[in-house]
Amino acid sequence: MSFPKVLLIGDSITQTYAPAAAEALREVAHVELIPDNGGDSTNVLAHLGDWLGGGGWDVVHFNCGLHDLKFDPEKDAYQVPLEAYEANVREVVAWLQRETSARLVWATITPVVEEWHNACKPFLRHERDVEAYNAAALRVVRAAGVEVGDLHAFVVERGVRQMICPDGVHMTEDGSRALGHEVAGFLEPICRALT
């Protein structure tokens, strides 16, 4: 029996929870992670063709946003402004729906602890921006009929300061493992339905 093929697209948060997700799904799916940090939505859009390769993906679980909402105080600018981010997510969804027959699952942007993050980085991230960018992406994906795995809500429910490292954005080892299991729990029934 061949397992469904699942592709995980995302940034360093995805990179750290991918091993736990793959391990938890090992008896129902073949899980792969894109070879690079997906970065911002502009980068994701530019690399979809490379990452999805020859196709054959049954499920694509995707996210971007933490890089988009980085604010540079010297330039007084976001890496990708909110309106451009929303447009990019719309393009990503349209591309995936046009070029693949995969079940699509959007993962929301995880929280930040801004006082921790902004004390140690030259650029800023704010939770209010996480909420705004999440809202923009959710408008797009819900309108397109894409399923949503709400990782933001999961981290909030588990305790932001317990799951996130002192850098204010990345997950602790336990946090990454918990996220991986959450993703696997969401994807498992989808994968079982495809076998």
Positions of predicted regions on the chain:
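Catalytic nucleophile-elbow at a beta strand-turn-alpha helix junction centered on a G-D-S/GDSL motif
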Residues: 2-19, 40, 69
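Alpha-helical cap/lid subdomain in secreted, periplasmic
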Residues: 2, 24-30, 43-195
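The conserved SAM/SAH-binding core of class I Rossmann-like methyltransferase domains
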Residues: 9, 34, 107
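Short beta->alpha junction loops
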Residues: 33-39
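Short beta->alpha junction loops/turns
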Residues: 11-14, 37, 169, 176
